[in-house]
Every structure is written in C-alpha cells, then in structure tokens.
Amino acid sequence: LSRDYDISVQGQAYLLRPDTPREGIIRQPRPGEADGQLSEPLRSQASEANLIMRPPGVTPNTLRILEATEYAQRQGIFMEFHHAAYQAYWEDGLDLGDLAVIEGLAQQVSLNSTELMERLESSFYTNTIMEQYQQALGYGIRGIPTFVVGNLLFTGAHPYEIFTSAISKVLAGENS
C-alpha cells in the first residue's frame, strides 16, 4: 500500500490473550481445522488476502514479541520485522514467545539483537505496550488484526481492494 499511496503504517500493540502464561500453551485444534488448515471463516479470509496461515502448535504469550515490534518500529523497520514475525508464526510454526526466536528475527532484519535482548530482559517497553493495549480496549477493539484508516475501523484479514477502497475514501474526504 505504501508503494501505491503516500501513507505510513504505524503498529500498535494488542494482547489478544493477556492471560497466557509466559511460556505459552499448547494450542488445541479448533472445530473445522484439519490437515494443517485453519477453520472457516479464517481460512477463506486468509485465502482472499493471499496469506499463508497454518494452525500453529503453540499459543504464545505475545508480550515480548510486541515489545520487540515496538523496538523495531522505533528503529524504522516495523514492517520488515512484522513480516518476519508473521512468517515465523503463521508459515513456519515458530513460538513468538521464545526469546531465541525473537533474537533470530531481529538478526534476520538487521536489528541490534544484543540491544533488543537487553531491553526485553529489562521490560523496557512493557509500559508502552500496556498503554497501547488499554487504548485499543478503550476504542472497543477486541480482535486482531484491526486496521484504522481515517475514521474507518475494520478487523480481520481482508483483500487488498478493501484497503485501497478505504484509503481512497479517506483521501476523497469520505472519512466517516
């Protein structure tokens, strides 16, 4: 989208399951999941958005990966880190709560992994993440991904055309 429009993307943290223990939990298959495929409607939404999504084996505690994402955003490479984390979780089945996985992602996108790991160990971004989460709850957000384009808010995986339509409406002044 940023190639087609003069826009910037800013990530905000949302703890989907804030009660998940730090070590994560083994994910139980949901009704309708089979042969490495997600259940509906998520399977169709992912397909329409040209996304690869396989059921992961672990539901991670996402606080540390969200903190790492905040670090990446402050380094100016939010999208690169976000894409690497997405691929690690949904395509490769890696545990995003695992510090070794996070360190590998940081190295993959050329972040200073030593500095990042120090910040994760010291909970440097925890307050920022919790403030963003509380703000999202205040807006009534209860799921991910959620997108805000102007005054338009929508949740879930969507085809590219949905985003271009929303951006076009905002740019045309139809921002309600």
Regions found by a protein language model. Name each.
Residues 1-7, 11, 30-33, 70, ...:
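C-terminal cap of thioredoxin/glutaredoxin-like
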Residues 64-68:
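Conserved N-terminal beta-strand and adjoining loop/helix that marks the start
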Residues 52:
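Conserved active-site segments centered on acidic
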Residues 26-48:
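Short, structured active-site "lid" loops
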Residues 30, 56-63:
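Dinucleotide-binding Rossmann-like beta1-alpha1 core, especially the glycine-rich loop
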Residues 13-24:
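Short, charge-patterned binding micro-sites
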